Amino acid sequence: MSLGLLGNKIGMTQIFDESGNIIPVTILKVGPCVITQVKTTLNDGYNAIQVGYGNVSTKALTQPQLGHLQKSNIQPLKYLKEFHVSDPTEFNVGQILNVESFVAGQLINVTGKSIGKGFSGLQKRYNFARGPMTHGSKNHRAPGSIGMGTSPGRVLPGKKMAGQLGNKTANIKKLKIVQVNNDENILVVKGAVPGKPGNLLSIIPSK
């Protein structure tokens, strides 16, 4: 069962282990999440639970979104996401999920949006080598040739060129949980996770 939760990135810091080694860690505020819908193979074609996170005013939601939550008598929630489960009968609508489903030493996958860095050139975006800086060269950071001539007479799809860098979904796999704080719903994981502090994250156990 890969039960996932939603949360926010708080920021990075460092802690010391028993041997005195410094471990770079990220602090995550995870849940509490509310189960807003349970899907089964019989009714929906697959087994999953829909999880809601982040209390919000009713004015911030559309009528269909409000109706979906009010049908289950659940308070307005900002984010909804589905997670596949093997046995949906273990869950009930309105059930609260928190970090108690995770333990220290467990490996998790964290998904979120990476930091957007705007329109970037090839050196920054793809680590391309630059051109000569001297001897009369006028090609310092230019892309160079982007294709052949008459045949095929076009730029091939997928050609690496300058453009938007970041602000895309990034998935970091097998991050190790260092500490779990059940009272504050805090996870401390080794390493970095996508995005800036406050970024919405999806956390699921690694397979």
Swiss-Prot record:
Secretion signal span: none
SUPFAM superfamilies membership: Translation proteins (SSF50447)
Any GO molecular function: rRNA binding
Disulphide-bridged cysteine pairs: none
Gene Ontology terms: biological process: translation
Location(s) in or outside the cell: Plastid, Chloroplast
This protein's GO CC annotations: chloroplast; cytosolic large ribosomal subunit
Keywords, alphabetical: Chloroplast, Plastid, Ribonucleoprotein, Ribosomal protein, RNA-binding, rRNA-binding
Stated family: Belongs to the universal ribosomal protein uL3 family.
Subunit structure, interactors included: Part of the 50S ribosomal subunit.
Function: One of the primary rRNA binding proteins, it binds directly near the 3'-end of the 23S rRNA, where it nucleates assembly of the 50S subunit.
Name of the protein in question: Large ribosomal subunit protein uL3c
